[in-house]
């Protein structure tokens, strides 16, 4: 006889998870789980059902891989049959904190801990679906084994989004990040139709009520820099920007745990307590203390906690439009300056480019080897529409509100990776502080010709030598050669975009 557990509290789900041996309790009160062979996202196993209502609007390719509609229905039924004879957990949650733009979702999971993850990362509304919208169904069944020949999948696991049916199927997937990113992809497709820009960014608000956004790929500092004790957190990863508002798509945070320390990241450290989930972190067998330096299971160790675990947060989970926008890049070549001031055209150029390094990548098969990458919109794996749709919406929003945009390099200085050193968190925090206070909007600047970037000549709390990257290299000719190589990469990557001459001219130039 199977049981259906509906809308259990976090404490009840923790009880269930431990009694079912899904995880162990750590000394800090968090639930520690192991996700098995998949310790990151599996991009080759992610699909979108190809059907008439959305087929023409999706940017099909290596990221948005098509899946047959009939095969989806058959697989969904098969998974439903499998779970119908087993215990399962159901929660009713929202995706999107805006009363107009939320999606109601029914989350069904095979494990208690995946249901707790859903409760931590999605929004637990006071009242479910007050606008009586059509419900989305998310089914996450990690012990179901897909058969590629029969099911049309790529492997034994799959994440499949079906817009026509309003369904998301996760089968054979234990890594919980797939669940949140699948619903982010759904909102990334739906929100632009409503004149809302979906963004892979973190967001916080100062005492002065000014909102600041941080765009960036995994490991560039989105979560760390937005978790600022002097400011109020909106969210750490996914937001929507509509007229008059920036709202969180989520109700929790999914932070990296590698080398986590109370000194450097107190907000995250303190959030890991009872009700939080810690993924793939090794704990001491006796006293159950987590060892955040141990990466024997994966470098992509994670913690998932609800926003209620953050003391200084925006209670409404949304705020006003951003006065400052930060594009975080981790430049492993040591060529880019620590901070640049961007025009709106340059902002569009760098938003489309999404240049960074894959640092502690969240994708399966990624090792600790660093490599440069261009990830459109600073989150290419999650955006189903063509990139231009998002870039145009960004420019529109910036023009209407007058937001200032900055490119901040959290990567290397004084030489490339292996020669130079990485910017320290305190230096980056000093730069962010100058951006948020408005200091950077009114400083003496210089122009770096070939990179086509405007940088400040001096900044309080930052050694002036660091501000022009060429000055930090002992071998200036080596810097020039490295810069030329990086500029070439920018130019080559940007050839694929069909944009105005003004945007193209705002990027680095070989001339």
Curated annotation (Swiss-Prot):
**Gene Ontology CC:** cytosol
Q: Where does ATP bind?
A: 181, 200, 216-224, 265, 302, 428
Q: Which InterPro entries match?
A: PEP_carboxykinase_ATP, PEP_carboxykinase_C, PEP_carboxykinase_N
List each coiled-coil range. Answer: none
Q: In which pathway does it act?
A: Carbohydrate biosynthesis; gluconeogenesis
Indicate where this protein is primarily found. cytoplasm
- Biological role stated in the UniProt entry: Involved in the gluconeogenesis. Catalyzes the conversion of oxaloacetate (OAA) to phosphoenolpyruvate (PEP) through direct phosphoryl transfer between the nucleoside triphosphate and OAA.
Identification of the protein by name: Phosphoenolpyruvate carboxykinase (ATP)
In which organism is this protein found? Hahella chejuensis (strain KCTC 2396)
The taxonomy runs: Bacteria, Pseudomonadati, Pseudomonadota, Gammaproteobacteria, Oceanospirillales
């Amino acid at each position: 006889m199977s049981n259906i557990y509906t809308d259990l509290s976090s404490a009840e789900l923790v009880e269930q998870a431990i009694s079912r041996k899904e995880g162990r309790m750590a000394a800090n009160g968090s639930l520690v789980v192991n996700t098995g062979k998949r310790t990151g996202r599996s991009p080759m196993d992610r699909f979108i059902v190809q059907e008439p209502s959305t087929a023409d609007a999706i940017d099909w390719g290596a990221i948005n891989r098509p899946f047959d509609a009939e095969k989806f229905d058959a697989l969904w039924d098969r998974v439903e049959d499998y779970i119908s004879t087993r215990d399962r957990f159901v929660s009713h949650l929202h995706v999107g904190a805006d009363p107009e733009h939320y999606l109601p979702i029914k989350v069904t999971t095979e494990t208690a801990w995946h249901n707790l993850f859903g409760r931590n990362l999605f929004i637990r509304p006071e009242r479910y679906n007050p606008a009586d919208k059509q419900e989305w169904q998310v089914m996450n069944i990690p012990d179901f084994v897909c058969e590629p020949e029969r099911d049309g999948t790529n492997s034994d696991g799959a994440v499949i989004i079906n817009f026509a049916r309003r369904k998301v199927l996760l089968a054979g997937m234990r890594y919980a990040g797939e669940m949140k990113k699948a619903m982010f992809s759904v909102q990334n497709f739906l929100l632009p139709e409503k004149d809302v820009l979906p963004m892979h960014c973190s967001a916080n608000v100062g005492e002065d009520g000014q909102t600041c956004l941080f765009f960036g790929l995994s490991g560039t500092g989105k979560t760390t820099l937005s978790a600022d004790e002097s400011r109020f957190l909106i969210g750490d990863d996914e937001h929507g920007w509509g007229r008059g508002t920036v709202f969180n798509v989520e109700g929790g945070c999914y932070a990296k745990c590698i080398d986590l320390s109370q000194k450097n990241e107190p907000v995250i450290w303190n959030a890991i307590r009872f009700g939080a989930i810690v993924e793939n972190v090794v704990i001491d067998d006796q006293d159950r203390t987590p060892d955040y330096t141990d990466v024997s299971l994966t470098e992509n160790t994670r913690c998932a906690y609800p926003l209620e675990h953050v003391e200084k947060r925006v209670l409404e989970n949304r705020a006003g439009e951003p006065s400052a926008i930060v594009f975080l890049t981790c430049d492993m070549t040591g060529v880019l300056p620590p901070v640049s001031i961007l025009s709106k055209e340059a902002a569009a150029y760098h938003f489309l480019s999404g240049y960074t390094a894959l640092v502690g990548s969240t994708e399966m098969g990624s090792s600790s080897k660093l490599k440069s990458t261009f990830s459109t919109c600073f989150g290419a794996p999650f955006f189903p529409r063509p990139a231009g749709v998002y870039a145009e919406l960004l420019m529109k929003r910036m023009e209407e509100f007058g937001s200032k945009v900055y490119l901040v390099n959290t990567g290397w200085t004084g030489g490339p990776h292996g020669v130079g050193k990485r910017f320290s968190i305190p230096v980056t925090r000093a730069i962010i502080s100058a951006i948020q206070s408005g200091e950077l909007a009114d400083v003496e600047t210089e122009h770096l010709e070939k990179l086509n970037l405007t940088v400040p000549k001096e900044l309080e709390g930052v050694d002036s030598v660091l501000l022009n990257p060429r000055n930090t290299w002992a071998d200036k000719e080596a810097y020039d050669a490295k810069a030329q190589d990086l500029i070439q990469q920018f130019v080559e990557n940007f050839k694929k975009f069909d944009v105005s001459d003004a945007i193209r001219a705002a990027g680095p130039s070989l001339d």
